[in-house]
């Protein structure tokens, strides 16, 4: 791995670490982070495949109250580096990502506990009207979030390929298979949570059509994407026509009422 690749990986790690807190650019999501890492390491295809697989798993990962979700940023960046540099399969990448996400969860809690100090300092600066101090506290807290992903990434990037291959090769098959099965279960849970959140009756037929086509046809992802786009455009056009027809009908009804009122006024006069 060249020095330029290591620098680019550290930049990606910093961006994903900060984005995992800001939740605006969504660059910490596996589909984005793994793709960027794959692009830097020269294996974009593996990055996209691993990112898409991990994204399905991460659909069910979210913070609920004080319960911290697994760390998608560390899992995405480091698992992609290990899979590509050690020439491993997607199954091994999923197994490594699940373990890294659990370890990153503890690291996230540790870093967020440290940033509480900066929050209290920012409150003090706010009372004193020190805007510059508040900005410094925000930036410092984000630096800690960036280092949370950058330091493990640097350690993994500096490890030799042979050492990584030896480490992954020594993992027992029972652990690897177990984590792969667990990852598959997490995918199903993530899908169920998304469908539950999108519990809109008039959209359910589209879900059923998609599942039936996936089960009984040989469509690939490109075909499903094109079909979904066509159905979305068709649905939008139908809804627009119905809305326009309803607006015309409402306008005609209101016009007839207005004429009737004018006649009443004439009679009263």
Curated annotation (Swiss-Prot):
Coiled coil: none annotated. GO terms for cellular component: plasma membrane. It is found in: Cell membrane. The chain crosses the membrane at residues 2-22, 35-54, 64-86, 90-110, 149-169, 181-201, 206-226. Residues 1-234 form the PTS EIIC type-4 domain. GO terms for biological process: phosphoenolpyruvate-dependent sugar phosphotransferase system. Its main location: membrane. It is a multi-pass membrane protein. PROSITE patterns: PTS_EIIC_TYPE_4 (PS51106). Keywords: Cell membrane, Membrane, Phosphotransferase system, Sugar transport, Transmembrane, Transmembrane helix, Transport. The phosphoenolpyruvate-dependent sugar phosphotransferase system (PTS), a major carbohydrate active -transport system, catalyzes the phosphorylation of incoming sugar substrates concomitant with their translocation across the cell membrane. This system is involved in fructose transport. The EIIC domain forms the PTS system translocation channel and contains the specific substrate-binding site. This is Fructose permease IIC component.
């Amino acid at each position: 791995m060249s020095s330029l690749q290591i620098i680019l990986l550290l930049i990606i790690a910093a961006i994903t670490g900060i984005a995992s807190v800001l939740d605006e650019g969504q660059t910490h999501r596996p589909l984005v982070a793994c793709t960027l890492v794959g692009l830097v390491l020269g294996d974009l295809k593996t990055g996209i495949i691993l990112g898409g697989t991990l994204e399905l798993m991460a659909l069910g990962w979210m913070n609920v109250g004080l319960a911290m979700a697994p760390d998608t940023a560390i899992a995405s960046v480091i698992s992609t580096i290990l899979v590509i540099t050690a020439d491993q399969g997607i199954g091994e990448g999923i197994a490594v990502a699940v373990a890294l996400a659990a370890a990153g969860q503890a690291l996230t809690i540790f870093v967020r506990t440290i940033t509480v100090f900066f929050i209290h300092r920012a409150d003090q600066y706010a009372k004193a009207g020190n805007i510059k101090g508040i900005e410094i506290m925000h930036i410092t807290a984000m630096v800690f979030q960036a280092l949370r992903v950058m330091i493990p990434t640097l350690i993994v990037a500096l490890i030799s390929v042979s050492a990584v291959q030896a480490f992954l090769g020594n993992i027992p098959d029972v652990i690897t298979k177990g984590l792969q099965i667990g990852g598959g279960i997490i995918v199903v849970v993530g899908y169920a949570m998304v469908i539950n959140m999108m519990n809109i009756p008039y959209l359910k037929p589209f879900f059923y059509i998609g599942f039936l086509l996936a089960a009984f046809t040989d469509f690939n992802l490109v075909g499903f994407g094109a079909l979904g786009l066509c159905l979305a455009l068709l649905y939008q056009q139908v809804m627009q026509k119905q809305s326009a027809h309803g607006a015309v009908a409402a306008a005609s009804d209101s016009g007839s009422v207005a004429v009737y009122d004018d006649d009443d006024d004439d009679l009263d006069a």
